[in-house]
């Protein structure tokens, strides 16, 4: 029997990235697409608790899918509980744009869906493809000019390896970032602290009232061994992630503050 995979994303069910992943995985698994109906980038692991969630059965290029009127986390939960799928893995992506560093995995809906699946008992793998032009992240994902050919090979190979060997026991999610041009092989990495400089741009609307854009250029350097450094070298970054955010090495110092 072929393994079952729940495939989701944050770019939306119409994204070329999710269908590239579908093409990569369909020959080796029974893949069910359950993804947000619309673009949901940068919503992280947020969840819809104040509005109903609708899931509609649709077809895209003849392939069945579920379009969920919510966030990536909602899609994962709907797939696991409402549709009663019992996948061997949840795969999220291929995201159009890299998801690197602490700041990105905390805001990424792609990684958020994989984390939610892991929290519900099914390990997840998140796949993201680097873009050379950061503006490409904000274009229509259904009309992306990105080439997914190399990324599809990575998706299939990574999933085949995990299905054959099992998930790393101490990890809950594997975050895979694929460079726009692959020059090397796989590199197991840890998260960099930041990917972008943080900036705020103030503008005035037509009535003269201020509004703000949060923006900032990419950082130019990154520590060796980090996901950012690996992708910039042209390596595929593979970062094991755990749900447990507890800073256990800080236990003793924290006790000195609060338990004296």
From Swiss-Prot:
Keywords: Cytoplasm, Hydrolase, Metal-binding, Nucleotide-binding. Transmembrane segments: none annotated. Pfam families: SurE. Coiled coil: none annotated. It is found in: Cytoplasm. One of its GO terms (molecular function) is nucleotide binding. Its cofactor is a divalent metal cation. Binds 1 divalent metal cation per subunit. InterPro entries: SurE (IPR030048), SurE-like_Pase/nucleotidase (IPR002828), SurE-like_sf (IPR036523). It comes from the Archaea. A divalent metal cation binds at residues 10-11, 41, 95. GO terms for cellular component: cytoplasm. Its EC number is 3.1.3.5. It catalyses: a ribonucleoside 5'-phosphate + H2O = a ribonucleoside + phosphate. SUPFAM superfamilies: SurE-like (SSF64167). HAMAP family: SurE. Belongs to the SurE nucleotidase family. PANTHER family: 5'-NUCLEOTIDASE SURE, PHOSPHATASE, PUTATIVE (AFU_ORTHOLOGUE AFUA_4G01070)-RELATED. Nucleotidase that shows phosphatase activity on nucleoside 5'-monophosphates. This is 5'-nucleotidase SurE.
